[in-house]
């Protein structure tokens, strides 16, 4: 079924910043998609087009991207006569029209908005749930419910506290199902709230951009201690492990790392990549840390490779790989990490996101699907993670509706699958063995 109409508009994301929403019409109805936006963005990400007009939304408007859709992309896709089930052809047509390496002509936020809407329309055209349509696009016969990685303590660029490292996550790998994982996660989250309140007072339980608590602590080990205490207190020591997103590019200064980067600069307190690696080794020894994302700067390749060779845990590339096949290929060659963080808006189309996922999986990597810190009520990534069988997703704490929208959709998918539903659990790094 060909496209009848495409219309884009500017809406607001969960941080109150403008983002792009796209309505796509076919004979089957209206299909709507909204684009997320990151705070700690890798310099190699596809370009998110902002207006730059300081008189409007402090320069963050997206009317240019919206206009590119309404004036150029929409007429081209409609006149092509392509069916919405032809995802790759439609995505490639947009990439050709843009013609740049990093989507800087139209903006990745313009192309992705249309690409997501096409995918939703394609599923309806086939009379399939979105996750099954995505599985078909990826050539997958399996469907797997992921382990959620709940970001329960926020730091870095996501919170106004002193904490340098950006996310401290809990993964309920011992849960029996996704629904059970949600319960475990929520119970530990509420227990953690009590632990933080008792230690630092009620104002320390304010939440960051992704719904995690943001107590004003400086030591990253203190955050790990709080999470461990909450897990133990909730009674889930055997069922829950810890993940971290360090987002080290945010505090990389002149070849060294500043773990107090939110205070006035002081070169004397900066540490080397080796020293930072030793700190992580301590974390892994002392806490049930099984996954560390972006432990080093996006260009500190030597530190990545050395560290990954020396630890037996999951090392996730985000700013390093930016869901980009060329960066992934280099990371595979240099053995820099062993898991890809998949963010559709880093690369800017559904087709390229699927290709990036397959490339990582073919090289024996894990894949974790991810939200952005600036989110919307769109639930596309919930269906994406099931269809791509990656076995793990991070989309914030069990708090804030733009986060819960994804988790709730995953519970619905699990319910819909019934007996067919399989939960990744302890195999979250390699769910294909299920």
UniProtKB/Swiss-Prot annotation:
It is found in: Cytoplasm; Cell membrane. Mg(2+) 2 binds at residues 245, 293, 318. GO terms for cellular component: cell cortex; cell surface; cytoplasm; growth cone; membrane; membrane raft; neuronal cell body; perikaryon. GO terms for molecular function: enzyme binding; identical protein binding; magnesium ion binding; phosphopyruvate hydratase activity; protein-containing complex binding. Substrate binds at residues 158, 167, 293, 318, 370-373, 394. Pathway: Carbohydrate degradation; glycolysis; pyruvate from D-glyceraldehyde 3-phosphate: step 4/5. It is an enzyme of class 4 (lyase). The modification Phosphothreonine is found at residue 26. Mg(2+) 1 binds at residue 40. The modification N6-acetyllysine is found at residues 5, 60, 64, 89, 126, 193, 197, 199, 202, 228, 233, 256, 335, 343, 406. The active site is at residues 210, 343. PROSITE patterns: ENOLASE. The modification N6-(2-hydroxyisobutyryl)lysine is found at residue 233. SMART domains: Enolase_C, Enolase_N. Mg(2+) is required for catalysis and for stabilizing the dimer. Disulfide bonds: none annotated. GO terms for biological process: canonical glycolysis; gluconeogenesis; glycolytic process; response to estradiol; response to xenobiotic stimulus. The modification N6-succinyllysine is found at residues 60, 89, 228. The modification N-acetylserine is found at residue 2. It catalyses: (2R)-2-phosphoglycerate = phosphoenolpyruvate + H2O. Its main location: cytoplasm. There is a cross-link at residue 202 (Glycyl lysine isopeptide (Lys-Gly) (interchain with G-Cter in SUMO2)). SUPFAM superfamilies: Enolase C-terminal domain-like, Enolase N-terminal domain-like. Mammalian enolase is composed of 3 isozyme subunits, alpha, beta and gamma, which can form homodimers or heterodimers which are cell-type and development-specific. Has neurotrophic and neuroprotective properties on a broad spectrum of central nervous system (CNS) neurons. Binds, in a calcium-dependent manner, to cultured neocortical neurons and promotes cell survival. This is Gamma-enolase. It comes from Rattus norvegicus (Rat).
């Amino acid at each position: 079924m060909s496209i009848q109409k495409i219309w884009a508009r500017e809406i607001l994301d969960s941080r109150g910043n403008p983002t792009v929403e796209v309505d796509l019409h076919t004979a089957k109805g209206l299909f709507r998609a909204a684009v997320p936006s990151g705070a700690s963005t890798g310099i190699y990400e596809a370009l998110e087009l902002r207006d730059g007009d300081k008189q409007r939304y402090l320069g963050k408007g997206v009317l240019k991207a919206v206009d590119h859709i309404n004036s150029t992309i929409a007429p081209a896709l409609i006149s092509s006569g392509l069916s919405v089930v032809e995802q790759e052809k439609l995505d490639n047509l947009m990439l050709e029209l843009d013609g740049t390496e990093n989507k800087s002509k139209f903006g990745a936020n313009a192309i992705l908005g249309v690409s997501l809407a096409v995918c939703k329309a394609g599923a309806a055209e086939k009379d399939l749930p979105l996750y099954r349509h995505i599985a078909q696009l990826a050539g997958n016969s399996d469907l797997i419910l992921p382990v959620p990685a709940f970001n329960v303590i926020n730091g870095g660029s996501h919170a106004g506290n002193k904490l340098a490292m950006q996310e401290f996550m809990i993964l309920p790998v011992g849960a029996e199902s996704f629904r059970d994982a949600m319960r475990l996660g929520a119970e530990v989250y509420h227990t953690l709230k009590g632990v933080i309140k008792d230690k630092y007072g009620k104002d320390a339980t304010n939440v960051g951009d992704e719904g995690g608590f943001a107590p004003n602590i400086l030591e990253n080990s203190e955050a790990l201690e709080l999470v461990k205490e909450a897990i133990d207190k909730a009674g889930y020591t055997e069922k829950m492990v810890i993940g971290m997103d360090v987002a080290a590019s945010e505090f990389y200064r002149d070849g060294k790392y500043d773990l107090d980067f939110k205070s006035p600069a002081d070169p004397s307190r900066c540490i080397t990549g080796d020293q930072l690696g030793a700190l992580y080794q301590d974390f892994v020894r002392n806490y049930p840390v099984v996954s560390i994302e972006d432990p080093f700067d996006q260009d500190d390749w030597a530190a990545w490779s050395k560290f990954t060779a020396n630890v037996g845990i999951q090392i996730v590339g985000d700013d390093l790989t930016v869901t980009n096949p060329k960066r992934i290929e280099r990371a595979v060659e240099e053995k820099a990490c062993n898991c890809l963080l998949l963010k559709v808006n880093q690369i800017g189309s559904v087709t390229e996101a699927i290709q990036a996922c397959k490339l990582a999986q073919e090289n024996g990597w894990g894949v974790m699907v991810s939200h952005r810190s600036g989110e919307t009520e769109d639930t596309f990534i919930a269906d994406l993670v099931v269809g791509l069988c990656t076995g793990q997703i991070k989309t914030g704490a069990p708090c804030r509706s733009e986060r819960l929208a994804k988790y709730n959709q995953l519970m619905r998918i699990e319910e819909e699958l019934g007996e067919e539903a399989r939960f990744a659990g302890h195999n979250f790094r390699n769910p294909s063995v299920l």
